[in-house]
Amino acid sequence: LTKPQLNILPAEDPVEYELEGVGQVQIKDDIGLSFAAALRSFLRQDPEIILVGEMRDKETVDIGLKAALTGHLVFSTLHTNDAPSTITRLQNMGTPDYLISAACQLVVAQRLARRNCKDCKVPDDDVNPKVLQDLGFTAEVASRVKAIKGKGCPKCKDTGYKGRQGIYCLLYTSDAADE
């Protein structure tokens, strides 16, 4: 996304990583530079891509979704428990359904799960195939699942875990969802 010909405008609180070739804006509510104020300013600068650190209030949501409707690619974050809850959260903030369905193309929810320690992982034979079937796996696939667990070692401080792994849920919108 970082091509010189693209006008990318991010509003962040705080700016966590410096992006080469991108003019980042640090939100400062104490001087009136809110996410909503930054978005209003961005729309006068002919951006191709707008990054909004967080949709915290109705005004920011409305401006962000309207920017998406006028041809801008808008990325943002919103605190919810899962991807489908994003729609409910936007509705609870007072956003009309037509605006949500017209402007939202993709919702990504992220969870960070603990990763088994590579240095002490061992097979876990305690996985019940019935539990896997209840989760939607076919009996054939469930019987072939090989699970692992960390037994604990000095490298993971005897926890069996070291690091985190992203798990993502994607919610695509469609014409059927619009109806």
Give the role of each language-model region:
Residues 175-179:
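A short, hydrophobic C-terminal helix/tail in secreted or cell-surface proteins
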Residues 1-174:
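Short, flexible helix-loop junctions that flank or precede catalytic/ligand sites
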